[in-house]
């Protein structure tokens, strides 16, 4: 799609060469044939280092656009990006190609195997499983009944995916119009699970917008957990039931998230940190500490001291 067509579709004005755009991508990873966007001053610092051929940007940030990068100036770059994401979304089904199923793998009846799927030696795919196009499953995995693994997702060796979990569904991403409409952002990334990962029943892990949602090796995820788009979980994390991680949350290695805990988006939790049940992570947290509470979350010993003071206060009164 030419920049002039994109400008017409989004109501943007543009300066620079009317180049052909083949995909949308992040500022970090875009190339000369791709379009990116910047929705605020926080991300404007990344524009100079980007290789994007063009960028959706608001008028007040155009000074950050380097020479050689075309600027599509619009009132709401995030909304313009959402509108375009449908046009650049990957197709639901790709061109049919043969799949590579290892001889020692077991595929039970009623499992759907898409195009160009790979299933490693010794893996078991149970009844009712859906494997989308280009899915790769390693060796000795057990994929339990009714698991859904959407297109392009990668499952490492020795993984257990329990019944009804969903890997690689679209993330919960929308842009909003002035009249209150919510415009869907189509996600072109995927989910990558390392080795020895376990995903509990009815857990959902969303695909990234452009890149991968990453679950590193030896991480264990309980039932009924929601992991948002572009999250990154380090080695050996333990995620207890009903935890919810908002998009782009980053957990270091061996982080423990207690039951019904959660995180706001774009926060980082350091290695070996532990979040107590119902803890709410709203800011970056240091490595190796225990935390509790929600607003604000705090070190566990401080939380207990405050609870004791509250109890003494009510006993006196």
Curated annotation (Swiss-Prot):
GO terms for cellular component: membrane. Pathway: Bacterial outer membrane biogenesis; LPS lipid A biosynthesis. The keyword Lipid biosynthesis applies. It holds the Pfam family Hexapep. Homotrimer. Catalyzes the N-acylation of UDP-3-O-acylglucosamine using 3-hydroxyacyl-ACP as the acyl donor. Is involved in the biosynthesis of lipid A, a phosphorylated glycolipid that anchors the lipopolysaccharide to the outer membrane of the cell. This is UDP-3-O-acylglucosamine N-acyltransferase.
């Amino acid at each position: 799609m030419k920049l002039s067509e994109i400008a017409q579709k989004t109501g943007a004005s543009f300066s620079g060469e009317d180049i052909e755009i083949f995909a949308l991508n992040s500022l970090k990873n875009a190339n000369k044939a791709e379009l990116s966007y910047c929705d605020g001053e926080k991300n404007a610092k990344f524009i100079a280092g980007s290789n994007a051929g063009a960028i959706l940007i608001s008028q007040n940030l155009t000074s950050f656009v380097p020479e050689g990068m075309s600027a599509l100036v619009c009132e709401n770059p995030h909304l313009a990006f959402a509108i375009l994401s449908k046009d650049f979304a990957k197709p639901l089904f790709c061109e049919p190609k043969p799949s590579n199923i290892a001889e020692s793998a077991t595929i039970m009846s009623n499992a759907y195997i898409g195009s160009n799927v790979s299933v490693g030696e010794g893996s078991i795919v149970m009844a009712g499983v859906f494997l989308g196009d280009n899915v790769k499953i390693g060796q000795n995995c057990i994929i339990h009944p009714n698991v859904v693994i959407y297109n392009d997702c990668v499952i490492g060796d020795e993984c257990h995916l329990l019944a009804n979990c969903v890997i690689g569904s679209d993330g919960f991403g929308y842009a909003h119009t002035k009249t209150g409409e919510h415009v869907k952002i189509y996600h072109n990334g995927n989910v990558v699970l390392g080795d020895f990962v376990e995903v509990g029943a009815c857990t959902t892990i969303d695909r990234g917008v452009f890149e991968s949602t990453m679950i590193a090796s030896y991480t264990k995820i309980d039932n009924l957990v929601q992991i948002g788009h572009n999250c990154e979980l380090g080695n050996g994390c333990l995620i207890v039931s009903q935890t919810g991680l908002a998009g782009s949350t980053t957990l270091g290695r061996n982080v423990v998230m207690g039951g019904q805990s959660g995180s706001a988006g774009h926060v980082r939790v350091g290695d070996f940190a532990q979040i107590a049940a119902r803890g709410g992570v709203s800011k970056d947290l240091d490595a190796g500490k225990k935390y509790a509470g929600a607003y604000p979350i705090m070190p566990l010993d401080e939380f207990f001291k405050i609870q004791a003071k509250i109890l003494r206060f009510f006993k006196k009164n």
